[in-house]
Swiss-Prot record:
Substrate binds at residues 45, 130, 271, 292, 321, 325, 348. Its cofactor is Mg(2+). Mg(2+) binds at residues 219, 245, 271. It comes from the Bacteria. This is D-galactonate dehydratase family member SBI_01856. Keywords: Carbohydrate metabolism, Lyase, Magnesium, Metal-binding. Binds 1 Mg(2+) ion per subunit. One of its GO terms (biological process) is carbohydrate catabolic process.
Length: 411
């Protein structure tokens, strides 16, 4: 005879907040009968309302009456119970619930989440930020500015001659923000040949300028063929990159075997992956050095830990996606995982506009090139709901890319 379930608390309310303090975020609030509140992040850049609807219409009704302490059972319930599972909308929704439940468990026990994950294995988490410039001198100035801010690792992106817009390069004084507000996505023109001619010169100039100590990263953003990726990797080996990111479209994983045979440059991929199964071949065949899965988009803390555990066996490290297109709740969750995970290598961090820090009050902090989640119970982030309500959702889309002949290509 099975033992009756012992329930110490009950979920009584689930609310979805969509707010746009400078850019769109989706937050999930779970409230228990004992008055505990847990926060999760459900932001999916350019598709925020799809996740908000999935949560409100298909997930929230299922959570009422459940025991918030049963985190893994709830994860399995939402994942296996959705026959049409996987995909960014489903996994981001599950991730938001998972984060909120870990937040509640931390508050219920008076512990920061990283303590519930086994405790800290490091004192702080190395982070990298972004630097860009249309010309090499501008890029070098931007890299110097990041170094003055204490960063020990920088992703460098530059303009390309003949192209009016380039992924990762700011168009003005403000930081880079790819999502444009409006009724339709912006169209950018892309030329791979120009990029392949220009990128090695740019990154070599950055390395010569900064010397050997700075960790230097670069993102090709899924735009290359296998042959082009291998060629670029070979050209960048003397630059000593920390990693070369997303060289080919993520759907075509088999091509990483070809690329791996032709270059020793460290490879990173995974920000668009949603489950451990998408990472499995790349990890177990050691076709990558870093997996970049995001805690929000990959089913939350519970599932990111599964990815980390598989990766650790095969000596693959984590470097999760975490720019400003996920909220401070997501960054906090990633930091708690990072502090407690042996093969966690580095965390992406671009910072936020000041108003975002006001809406999402957080315990995590940055100093000297590193982040720490703080020691408040739970995730250490609270949302000012009244302030969030002052920033209603504004439609925004990530750009699309076309070649010079007008045909579509990967952005």
């Amino acid at each position: 005879m099975s033992r009756p379930a012992h329930k110490t608390d009950t979920i009584v309310a689930v609310d979805v907040l969509v707010t746009s303090p400078g850019r769109n975020f989706v937050a999930l609030k779970i409230t228990t009968e004992q008055g505990l509140v847990g926060w999760g992040d459900a932001t999916l850049n350019g598709r925020e309302l799809a996740v908000a609807s999935y949560l409100r219409d298909h997930v929230a009704p299922l959570l009422i009456g459940r025991d918030p302490a049963r985190i893994e059972d709830t994860w399995q319930y939402l994942y296996r119970g959705a026959y049409w599972r996987r995909g960014p909308v489903t996994m981001t929704s599950i991730g938001a619930v998972d984060l909120a439940l870990w937040d509640i468990k931390g508050k219920a026990t008076g512990q920061p989440v990283y303590q519930l994950l086994g405790g800290a294995v490091r004192d702080r988490i190395l982070t990298y930020t972004h630097a860009s410039g249309w010309e090499i001198p501008q890029l070098l100035d931007a890299v110097d500015e990041r170094r003055e801010q204490g960063f020990l690792a920088v992703r460098a992106q530059s303009g390309i001659p003949g192209l009016a817009t380039v992924y990762g390069v700011s168009s003005g004084e403000a930081g880079y923000e790819p999502a444009d507000r409006g009724a339709a996505p912006a169209v950018e023109v892309w030329d791979t040949d120009s990029y392949l001619r220009h990128a090695p010169r740019v990154l070599a100039a950055v390395r010569e300028h900064v010397g050997p100590e700075l960790k230097l990263l670069h993102d090709a953003h899924h735009r290359l063929t296998p042959g082009q990726a291998a060629r670029l990797g070979r050209a960048l080996e003397e630059v000593d990159l920390y990693w070369l990111e997303d060289v080919t479209p993520a759907e075509n994983q088999e091509v990483l075997r070809h690329i791996r045979h032709h270059t020793t440059v460290p490879l990173a991929i995974g920000e668009v992956f949603n489950t451990v199964w998408e990472c499995q071949t790349l990890i177990t065949e050691q076709l990558i050095d870093f997996v970049r899965t995001c805690v929000t988009h990959a089913g939350g803390i519970s599932h990111l830990r599964r990815i980390a555990a598989l990766a650790e066996v095969w000596q693959v490290r984590l470097g999760p996606h975490g720019p400003s297109d996920v909220s401070p709740v997501a960054l906090a969750a990633s930091l708690h995982v990072g502090l407690a995970t042996p093969n966690f290598a580095i965390q992406e961090y671009m910072g936020y506009e000041p108003v975002v820090h006001e809406v999402f009050r957080h315990a995590w902090s940055y100093a000297d090139g590193h982040l720490h989640p703080g020691d408040q119970p739970g995730l250490g982030v609270e949302v000012d709901e009244a302030l969030a309500a002052r920033f209603p959702y504004e439609p925004a889309y990530l750009p699309i890319a076309r070649r010079r002949d007008g045909s579509m290509t990967d952005w």
